[in-house]
Design a protein with these regions (language model features):
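Conserved, structured core segments of small domains
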Residues: 1-99
């Protein structure tokens, strides 16, 4: 399952604190990217962004995010991809049934 994890730094959080925490955890994994981390995006302006994390275990997702929770808050949602053309076809059918 793919999870959209929006993060926003707490007002007291500094760039240096975030950098230190990320590097600490990176070194603890012997310099390896977490296998479950599929994407990492920051929002323009800083202090917020989102992660795409893949895991079938919600407890593992919580464990992945918890080391950062003193620095930032998370809003987490399960997501899935859509095929655009297939969605258009299905929406046409729905619209035709409504007529």
């Amino acid at each position: 399952m793919l999870w959209y994890c929006h993060f926003k730094w707490h007002t007291h959080t500094t760039r240096e604190q975030v950098a230190k925490r990320i590097l600490e955890l990176h070194h603890a994994r012997e310099g390896q990217r977490p296998a479950s981390l599929k994407a990492w995006y920051n929002l323009a302006g800083g202090g917020a962004g989102f992660l795409l994390v893949e895991t079938d275990n919600p407890q593992a997702l919580t464990a992945f995010l918890q080391p950062y929770m003193d620095l930032m808050s998370f809003d987490v949602h399960a997501i899935y991809a859509l095929n655009y053309d297939q969605q258009i076809q299905e929406l046409r059918q729905v619209a035709q049934q409504a007529v």
